[in-house]
Amino acid sequence: MELFRYMEQYDYEQLVFCQDKQSGLKAIIAIHDTTLGPALGGTRMWTYESEEAAIEDALRLARGMTYKNAAAGLNLGGGKTVIIGDPRKDKNEEMFRAFGRYIQGLNGRYITAEDVGTTVEDMDIIHDETDFVTGISPAFGSSGNPSPVTAYGVYKGMKAAAKAAFGTDSLEGKTVAVQGVGNVAYNLCRHLHEEGAKLIVTDINKEAVERAVAEFGARAVDPDDIYSQECDIYAPCALGATINDDTIPQLKAKVIAGAANNQLKETRHGDQIHDMGIVYAPDYVINAGGVINVADELYGYNSERALKKVEGIYGNIERVLEISKRDRIPTYLAADRLAEERIERMRQSRSQFLQNGHHILSRR
């Protein structure tokens, strides 16, 4: 892998390698773009096949956070960390303390958070060494469990997509097929049930399905049958890549709006559902409630302020749909364009984030 050529191609700013022999820390911090502000992105711990695979993952995820944060209207850039190791057996306090010192050494250019393979407890240890971390324990002033807030954002985004498809954002009487009934999807189902939507649910966790059936009057189906249900809205809220060659021919929904990440297996599947007239709410726009919520911690967490910002996901989806119509492009491309246009407007007046007295961190 020719690192500098790759970084130049996608306009990355910085790649930081962090090593601590005593604790076993091997971490890679990727900072993609800080035009809008310091880079925010979680720390992932994973057993990568090679160091090159870890680098590629860090770079890819950091770029994704640039787009997610920009589209969400946050004054934050995109970054990501990967720690090479098995989160089940390689963790220790010294590792996360050492990592916290490396973050502190970046002087605010990068702010971390929990991700796959890391926990709130890990973030608390990092917090012992630096303030540039979010998603810590509520005892330290954090926002707590982000799932209800993420679900609320998905609910608002779904209403915006429904308005485009059906002429009204009311979900009363609409049938929504929800794939996955985990923490986020359960809270989404609660909002939908309260508005009077009819629910079809599936999950590999039978207890979660039974709970949704009992509490929301949902109808349960087998996991493989969720795609072919007669419904108005398909809400993927579990694994990614569920919009693919096998599932698209089965879909009867007019809207796809859910909490899952990386819903399109390939970009061409976004083209395909666009050509079919399906209104697709791009994943990283509609599921941004979690990152909006933790970002509010940087101001000193205020739940009312955070929820008001999350409600803005409705308008963000509307803008994506407007760009899609304006430029005659699928919504997944329109989401990228929304983020890129915001970054470009800011780039006119600043080129990169450097610590100063007038930015988001000065409010902490």
From Swiss-Prot:
This is Leucine dehydrogenase. NAD(+) binds at G180, V181, G182, N183, V184, A185, Y186. It comes from Bacillus licheniformis. GO terms for biological process: L-leucine catabolic process. It is an enzyme of class 1 (oxidoreductase). Homooctamer. Keywords: Branched-chain amino acid catabolism, NAD, Oxidoreductase. The gene is ldh. Its EC number is 1.4.1.9. The keyword Membrane does not apply. Belongs to the Glu/Leu/Phe/Val dehydrogenases family. One of its GO terms (molecular function) is L-leucine dehydrogenase activity. It catalyses: L-leucine + NAD(+) + H2O = 4-methyl-2-oxopentanoate + NH4(+) + NADH + H(+). The active site is at K80. Pfam families: ELFV_dehydrog (PF00208), ELFV_dehydrog_N (PF02812). Thermostable. Retains full activity on heating at 65 degrees Celsius for 1 hour, but loses the activity completely on heating at 70 degrees Celsius for 1 hour. Catalyzes the reversible deamination of L-leucine to 4-methyl-2-oxopentanoate. Can also use other substrates such as L-isoleucine, L-valine and L-2-aminobutyrate. The 2-oxo analogs of branched-chain and straight-chain amino acids serve as good substrates for the reverse reaction. Signal peptide: none annotated.
